[in-house]
Amino acid sequence: MVYTALTWQRLHGTAAGLVPSHLPQEGEKGSTHPTPRPLGTTPRVTAHIEPPRPWAAGAEPPLPAGDGSARESSPFIGSAAADGDSLLEGKNMALFEEEMDSNPMVSSLLNKLANYTNLSQGVVDHEEAEDSRPRESKAPCMGTFIGVYLPCLQNILGVILFLRLTWIVGAAGVLESFLVVSMCCTCTMLTAVSMSAIATNGVVPAGGSYYMISRSLGPEFGGAVGLCFYLGTTFAGAMYILGTIEIFLTYISPGAAVFQAETPEGEAAALLHNMRVYGSCTLALMAVVVFVGVKYVNKLALVFLACVVLSILAIYAGVIKTAFDPPDIPVCLLGNRTLARRGFDTCAKVRAVSNGTATTALWGLFCNGSSLDTACNEYFAQNNVTEIQGIPGVASGVLLDNLWSAYSDRGAFVEKKGVASVPTPEDGRASGLPYVLSDITTYFTVLVGIYFPSVTGIMAGSNRSGDLKDAQKSIPTGTILAIVTTSFIYLSCIVLFGACIEGVVLRDKFGEALQGNLVIGMLAWPSPWVIVIGSFFSTCGAGLQSLTGAPRLLQAIARDGIVPFLQVFGHGKANGEPTWALLLTALICETGILIASLDSVAPILSMFFLMCYMFVNLACAVQTLLRTPNWRPRFKYYHWTLSFLGMSLCLALMFICSWYYALFAMLIAGCIYKYIEYRGAEKEWGDGIRGLSLNAARYALLRVEHGPPHTKNWRPQVLVMLTLDAEQRVTHPRLLSFTSQLKAGKGLTIVGSVLEGTFLDKHVEAQRAEENIRALMGAEKMKGFCQLVVSSSLRDGCSHLIQAAGLGGMKHNTVLMAWPEAWKQPDSPYSWKYFVDTVRDTTAAQQALLVAKNIDAFPQNQERFSEGSIDVWWVVHDGGMLMLLPFLLRQHKVWRKCRMRIFTVAQVDDNSVQMKKDLQMFLYHLRISAEVEVVEMVENDISAFTYEKTLLMEQRSQMLKQMQLTKGEREREAQLIHDRNTASHTAASRAQAPPTPDKVQMTWTKEKLTAEKHRNKDAGAAGFRDLFSLKPDHSNVRRMHTAVKLNGVVLSRSQDAQLVLLNMPGPPKNRQGDENYMEFLEVLTEGLNRVVLVRGGGREVITIYS
C-alpha cells in the first residue's frame, strides 16, 4: 500500500504541524449536542417496514410529537438545518451523509420498527361510532388466557357435547367413540400446529384467520379457503340456532310447539316444522341484535362462556355423586325394548288393588281394552315388563356393557343387550306404540360427520389477534392448550358416560325413556336445569358469535377484491358495519335452518371446516418444503410431515363423513380457485406435450411479468459478476461457492461475465468461457443460468448485464461481485473506475449490491464452521437486506453452527439502552435469533492519523491529475511522491524546537529513521513542495474519520468473526472523488478477514408481517 509508513501509534499521537488551527482541540467545544429524544414517543407502524421516502423538495421532515430536538427535526447529517458554524458536525457518520434522506441512521428508526401497533377492525369501529364520547386509543392488552384460551374454549365446547355426545357413545360404544373423538382431536391438533407456524411467521394482522390464511396461501387458495371458512361459519350459526330451538322445544317448553302431532308417527315431522318456524324467528331476532348492537354480543361472551364452564362442572360433579349415591331414574323395558315414558306412569302390566288385580295405563296402550281378557299386542303378551336404573353409577360395572357399538337402522327399536326377549312377527313394527325408536340410521362414518363440528373453533384466538399483547406467543400457546383441555373433556366424558349411564338411555337421543328430559342433564348435579339452561344460553351465544363473525369475514374477502361479484358485500354502514354481508349471511343461514335437522346440518359445516383446515396444513407443508426466505416461524415445533399428516387426515375425514358432500365442497373450492386464477386471463392451447410445456413456461413468465413481487415475497435473485483470466477461467471460483451457500438451490441465479472485444473475434473464447463457467457451476452444485457478453469495453458489458440479464419477470434484483483487490496495481489502473460505475448502475436500476472482499478466503461448500459468528453491522437502514443474508446463509451446512450477532451504532445523543431494547423487540418480530449489541461512537476530535491519511490520499489524487503519465507510470510516480513527502516532513520535524504543551509528540518508527538516512536528495523534490501545502477538503476529512472510527470499532468486536456484513456507503455524487471513495472503503474494511459490503436497492424488504 501507499501508506506503509503510517503506524498504529498515529491513532493516538498528532504530528507537529499537521493539525491546522481551525480543528477543535482537546477540551474545546467542537459541536453542540441536542437534548436526547424522549422515550415516550411510539409511532404507529402498521405496514411492512420499507426504507422511508425522501421528504418533498425544500420541506423539513415533520417534527415528532413532543420532541424539540434540533437534530431530530432534521435527521439528515449535513442537511440545510444543520449547524452551519461547525463544519465537522456529525462527522462520525459523514461517510453515509449523502444518502441520509433515503437511508437514515438505524438509531432514528429502531423505535418505530420495534414498537408497532396493530389496528383492530370491525367491532372497535362500531363501538366508537356508537359512543359519542371521544375514546383514548388503547394498546392491545389481552394475554393468552383471556384473549385466546377462553374464546377457543367457548367456541369448541358447545351444542354437540350437550345434545349428541351421549347418543354417540351409546351408538358407537366407548371404544369406537374414543376413536371418533381421537381422530377429530388429532386433526385439529395437527392443524393448530400448522396454524401456529403460520400465525408466528410475522405479526398477525388485526383481521383474524382469513388474513392469516390468505396472506400465506396467496389470492387463489386464500379466496377459496376464505369462502369455505365463511360458509362453514355461516352453517355453524344455523347449527347453533337449531340446537337452541331443540333445547327449547324438547326440554324447556314442549307445549310451545306450533305444530302438534296427531299420531306418534307424525311427531318427527311436526318437530321439523316447529324447528323451521322457531329457527327462522330466532335467526331474524339474532340478525337484528347483531345489526343494532354488536358490542353487547361481545360483552355477553363471558356470560355465555360461564354457562359452558358451569355446565361441564355440573357434569363432573354428577359423575362423582353417582359413585356413592346414584340417582333414582327408572327406565321401563318391555322384553329388551325401551319404552317411551308417555301415556303411563307405572312400569307394569297390572297392579294390585284392594279387591284384586287391575290393568295399568301401559296395558291400555298395547291392548284393545282395559280388561285382562282383551286381545293385546303379541310382543306385549309374550314378554315381561321390567324396570332398570337409567343411571346406575360409576361403580355399577355398566362400562363393560357399553364398550362395543350398537348401530341400528332408522325406525329400529332401542334394545338392551343381554335381556331375554321372545321375538314375534311384526307387521308395522311400531304402529303407534310407545317404543323408543332410532330416528336415523347410524354407522361409524355418520357419527364422525355429526361429531366433528364439536372440535371446530380453534381459530377463535387468531380472530382476536389485533387485541393481543403478543399474538406470536399467545396464539400457539392458547390454542394448543384449549385443544388439549377440550380433548381431555371430550375423552373423559366418553368414558364417564359409558361408565355411568345405561346403554339404552345413551341411545335414547331425545330422552323419551326419561319422560322427555335431557340425558346429560339427569346425570348432572345439583339439578338437570343447570345443564338445560346452561346449554341453551351457550348455544344461543355461539349462534350470535357466528352471525357476528361471518359477515366480517365476507366483508374482508370482498374488500380484497379477489372475487369481483362479491365486492358489493364489502360496503356497509358509515361506521364500517357489514350490512349487506350480514343480509347474505342470514339468507345462507336460513337455508341451513330450513333443513331443520341438526344431524343433517352438522356434516355440511364439517366439510367446509375440514376443507379450510386441509389448506392450512397444505400451506404450512409447502412453505416448509420450499424454504422461502420469509418463512421464519417463531413457533419451532412444526414439521412438514406433521402438516402433511394433518392434510391427509382432513381429506380422509371429509370422505369418511360424506363422500358426496366432500366432492361438492371440493368442487365449490375448485371453481372459486379457477375463477380467481383465470379472471380476465386468456388461455392458449399448445400441441402435444412439448407445446404444453412451452405454454406453461410462457404462462408462468407472463404471470410474473405484471409487476414486482409483493414485498413479503421478496427474495434475492442474484446476478453473479465473474471475472475471467486470459485463458477464460474464473478468477474467483469461491464467489460461486458463496452464491450456492446463499441461495441453497432456491430462486433465480444468473452467472454473468464480460469479454472485451468484438463478438466476431471472440465467439470461440466466449464459448470456452461459458463451458468453463458451467463446469464450475456443476462442481459447486449450483442451479442457474449462464449469460456471457462480449463487449467493446468491460464497463459497457457490465452495464448491459445489469440492465438486460434474465427474461421477463425472471430477472435479477441483486448483483454479487468480488472486491477489486488489484485496484491500486499498475496493470489494472481502471479497475476501480469500472467498480464505481457498476455501483452506480445497480443503484440506478434499484438493485441490491453485494461486494465480497477477500473472496478467496471464503469457505468452499465442503468446509464446515463448527463455531464462530456472522456479525452484522447495521449502520443505516436501507431495506433490511442485512438481516436477511445471515438467515439465508445459516440455512446452509457451512454456516449452520455460526451464531448471529447484530451491532448497531449509537451517537452521543442516542439512548443506547432503549435502542438495544427496540432492536431486540424488532428482531423478535422478525423471528430472527441473534445477539444484540449497541456500540457507542463518541464524537472525539479527528486524529492526526486520519488527517494525514486524508492529506496523502488527496495529494496522490491531485498529482495524478496534474501529471499526464502513462498507465504503468502512475502508480510508481505516486509511490515516489509519497516517499519524498515522508522525507521532507522528517527533515522539517528535526529542525523544529521541542513541542509545546498543547502539541502531541510524534512517535518515530524504525521505518522513518531508515527513510531519513537513505532519503532521496533529488532537487526535484522541491517542485512538489507546493502540492503538499494544500489543506485537505473538510468533507474528505470527515469521511475518512468515519471510515477509521468505524473500522476501529468493527475490528475491536468482529476481528475473529467468520463473516462480517457491513453497510456499503454510496459513491460520491461528484465523480471527481471516485478514487477517494475506493480509499474510504479500503480503510473501512481494513484488517477484516471476510467481509460482505451490502448496499440496498430500495425494493428489498424484510418485514415483520412476512
From Swiss-Prot:
Record topological domains on the Cytoplasmic side: 1-143, 197-220, 465-474, 556-578, 623-636, 676-1106
Region annotation (Disordered) ranges: 17-83, 980-999
Coiled-coil intervals: none
InterPro entries: AA-permease/SLC12A_dom, KCL_cotranspt, SLC12_C, SLC12A_fam
UniProt: chloride 2 binding residues: 159, 453
Residue(s) carrying Phosphoserine: 74, 86
Binding site for K(+): 155-156, 453, 456
Pfam families: AA_permease, SLC12
Tissue expression as described in the entry: Widely expressed. Higher levels in heart, kidney and lung (at protein level).
Residue ranges annotated as Extracellular topological domain: 167-173, 250-273, 325-443, 498-528
UniProt GO molecular function: metal ion binding; potassium:chloride symporter activity
Catalyzed reactions: K(+)(in) + chloride(in) = K(+)(out) + chloride(out)
Keywords assigned by UniProt, alphabetized: Cell membrane, Chloride, Glycoprotein, Ion transport, Membrane, Metal-binding, Phosphoprotein, Potassium, Potassium transport, Symport, Transmembrane, Transmembrane helix, Transport
Chain residue ranges for the region called Scissor helix: 688-704
Oligomer and partners: Homodimer; adopts a domain-swap conformation at the scissor helices connecting the transmembrane domain and C-terminal domain. Heterodimer with K-Cl cotransporter SLC12A5.
Protein name per Swiss-Prot or TrEMBL: Solute carrier family 12 member 7
Natural source organism: Oryctolagus cuniculus
